[in-house]
């Protein structure tokens, strides 16, 4: 049977962990009473039969109220909070001696009261937040329905021409200017700062958070604005529509709108007062409302879970207390818990039913099953067959890799000054590229395993849906199956060369292997994790076209991964040139190295990941206005300069370039180490409870964090190989390069865990368990 502690910790909302009943602390307080009681029993071994009979008779209901009053050893008082808010505070008074250690009993009930007050206040705060969100979404639905009715009425009256049938729209009058991104960001930050106080001030912060009015930031002085929001008058209401600039088409349309608006002002006051609201815009607005309703429904379910688990926690700890002390406290205190606000309030249940009804009626076409796919998505069940195939493919990969290594050793392919240079220049880059790629993917699977074990909500951080979320077993299956295929193909390729086949006859095999993986990646059939593959393609697209796309956590996390895969990208570029130019047919592997534009492209590939990441920082600064993004941009600029000096030094090995490599690489390394430890991992806090770490740690062993910092430092210094020209004896320099590239991939895999741990703790500190989806419409006064 699973212990309640594990069951409780396994089912609670990770980001709200500090707001749940501190069950472990209550168990510690109860253990003090238990240890003291056991010590007294050893000194006084005699037992009283009369007391035992009386206590047993007192429990029987036949003795009525008299028996109940005798068992009433505590009284729970309900008071108003001293801060003057409407929050109730519970305080327990001991009417008689409960345990041999009275102080320990008082300490236990003080902690129990504190937990009950905390749960009540947090529930009220979140309930108020969700109710306000629900009221806002109800207005959004009304506006959306009204605009949809306007379209239907227009079509019914036959007003639309042949042109408008292609893109039906209604004309609305613009009544004011556009909104400010930074102003909205400041408002959000001020609201978040109130939540930050909760971690520092405990109950008082919860009280102030519950009683505080919404804070509005003054955005009049903000210079950075966006045309994503426009105000129009439709059906007797002034409504502001805000469509986020999340992709290039919206960004360019917003810029063209600004140009048209400025030209219309020159032509006259009435030149630009009409705004066409198309079906496309309404469709996007409907998507935004659908996403907001889904997140609200998820938050309401979290609040239900919060209530149920806390009730169980109170019940279990009171049962344990009764068992230790022999008293009947459970029925008395549990009655207070059941009558407290967080248990008797039904507002969350009512709102949850309303959200479900709205979704079914207006967004799912009265189809309940379709609505439930959005509101309650089913997660894929983990199959034992996946585990079986992981083991099968692992065995195949090990056997094929062993065979490949033996054949390579016998032929001397990887030795320095080998006669088989052609193989190392053409086939080996394919193997090393796939090796680095799937090593990275394997480490990502290890990351997922550790995140789940540490209760880090990575799917929420990455905004992964149930369809495109890969479990760690899925990742391991992809890795083992792919590497088995790669090792098998490369083993066959090398064996054919050993049997006397010419390079011309077998050289197409590595190219076909690469082509096969590319076809699987873009395959439109619903096989091989289609949703995850297409999500990966969309993320790569967002990175490549930075800063035109709005940057989310998954985008810049993936861009950071590419910064550690520069050798893989250079191999990919060389392989593409080798096969696209037809060099494999002429066996002229040096062609791609002789051509100037290829050499220039090789330099560009070394810069690209850092450039993409820098552009993402610029876009985040543009959207949010935080200077920390500009400082982060400087880190990637320093990395680009360091990479550029390394490439130049490889081309022209002079003392001047060597000094420049050392200087630039040292600056970039120090910059990156500081950002890794302080910003990305949140460590090196000198006033922390854990020396030079941070106050909250997801791993119990502090030594792991110190070891990880040292290991990250050592692996960051891999660039020294460029200066020292170190290599393994009798081993080709390309193998040495692969080994060093693999070390950087391992460093990135280690970095990933602590980066998401810090992000999760930031979410937990702000009790952020659901996304805040922007809403498309906002009513404004005519004066505005």
Swiss-Prot record:
Annotated knockout phenotype: No visible phenotype.
Its membrane topology: Multi-pass membrane protein
Topology feature Cytoplasmic, residues: 1-387, 451-474, 529-654, 725-784
PROSITE patterns assigned: EXS, SPX
Domain spans labelled EXS: 593-784
Predominant location category: membrane
Extracellular side: 409-429, 496-507, 676-703
A single BP term in Gene Ontology: phosphate ion transport
Key words, A-Z: Cell membrane, Membrane, Phosphate transport, Transmembrane, Transmembrane helix, Transport
Annotated family: Belongs to the SYG1 (TC 2.A.94) family.
Protein name: Phosphate transporter PHO1 homolog 1
